Amino acid sequence: IHKPISGVWEIRLSDVADTRTFDWEQAKKEEPVPPTGATLTVTAIAAEVSVMQQATADQGTGSATHDLWVTNRMGVFTGRLMSNPLGSARRQQLELAEKEQQIFEVEVPPGSPALMARVFGLSDSDADVDLYVFDCTSDECRPARTDADPKGDESVIIWNPSAGKWKIAVDAASLPSETVTYEYLDVVFNSSFGNVGVLDVPQERGQDSRWMAKAHVWSAGAGSHEPGRTPYPAVLLEGWEGSQSFPLSILELVSDRTPSRER
């Protein structure tokens, strides 16, 4: 769960192979399921990265080097920042009406390690807007991931998405007023757009600890992006458990706070 809201979460185990067939009404009942042997590991990690002011840029090549501060906001974990292909982002500020759905299409190039979608910055904090991602790379679109908690900050990351067409749906589940304004973001990461190289090593990161890393951003130029898309430099936060590594989150280096407006 990327960017979970604060509070209590409940985790349920089901013996179905396809979560689309999971009986959510049954899961809401108070009766416990029969005892079943299982092993469940849950890790809550929150880290943020900030770019220090002293960055050097090469205007001729579209590259820049940044010194980064990384802060661990939660419990102890072992991890590091990792290099990541440059992202190609679509940022928009949109208006959504009650019970309306807005659909966005994304073309994922071959070899993309991640596809990310996010809805945030709602004009009404009581509005409930949900996010759905569909894999349309085959003959029919299939549900891939959903973020549908009661709050309006929804985020989904698809690791190693199949190449081809994907669709993202933003759904106005419940709006106190007739409309709500929100910020929309989707990002495809691929080496054809450029690369963000990072120097860091896996270490134990204590609670509230900070560490430094250096990142070098290289961009293939504006011509590598489709119209309406811009470069999205970000690094990968990687966790370690024994000798096994796993992706935790994608952390943006530079935030663009001037999204385009659409009605």
Short names for language-model regions:
Residues 1-22, 132-184, 209-210:
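Noncatalytic accessory or regulatory domains flanking protease catalytic cores in secreted, cell-surface
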Residues 7-9, 209-212, 220-234:
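Short, solvent-exposed loop/turn segments enriched in Ser/Thr/Gly
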Residues 21-79, 189-196, 240-263:
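Long, low-complexity ectodomains and other extracytoplasmic segments of secretory-pathway proteins
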Residues 37, 77-81, 85-105, 124, ...:
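Surface-exposed binding patches on compact interaction domains or structured appendages
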Residues 94-140:
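Acidic, Ser/Thr/Pro-rich low-complexity intrinsically disordered segments
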Residues 126-129, 189-191, 217-222, 230, ...:
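Surface-exposed, glycine- and small/polar-enriched segments that build interaction surfaces at terminal
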